[in-house]
Amino acid sequence: MRKTAVYAFGGNALQSPVDEGGDASEVLARVMSDVIDLLEMDWSVVITHGNGPQVGHLLAMDDQQTQGLDSWVAATQGMIGHELSMHLQAILERRRRPERTAVLLTRVEVDKNDEAFAWPTKPVGPVLSSQTVMTADWDIAETVHGPRRVVASPLPIRIMELDVIQQLV
C-alpha cells in the first residue's frame, strides 16, 4: 500500500514576492517539483492550499458586494486548482508518469452562531493604503506587514465533500 502525503501551502506561497519580479506560474512550477519528487518515491499526494490573498483581491474588486464570501472562496479555489492541475499535469506528461490530476472544490459547514462572525480576524487581500483604510467600509486589522481587510474565520463543523475526498485518495 502506498503512503499518502498531504502537501499543504498557504495562499501567500502562490504569489511571487514583488522584489523577485516573478509571476505565479514560476512559483507553481517550483512547488510542483516537490510534488513530483514525492510521486517518484512512490507516494500518493494530496495537495491542499489556502487562498486568503486571492479572495481579498476579488473582494476588493467587488465594490458593490454583489457576491458572498463563499462565492469568492469557490472562485479562487477553482482558479488556483486549475493552475495547479495544469502545471502538475504538464510535468507528469513530460516525465511520462501515469498519474492524473483532479481538482475538487471544498465546502466547509460552520455554525452560523460562531462568535468569529462578530470578531473577524482572517486577513485577506493586499496591505491597504492609508486612503483605503480611511474610506473602506470593511473590517480592517493591523498585521505585521500593515493594515489588511479581515473576514470571519469560524471553526469548521464538517467538510462537506469528505466522502469524495476519501474516494479519491
Functional labels for PLM-detected ranges:
Residues 1-51, 57-63:
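N-terminal glycine-/serine-/threonine-rich phosphate-binding loop
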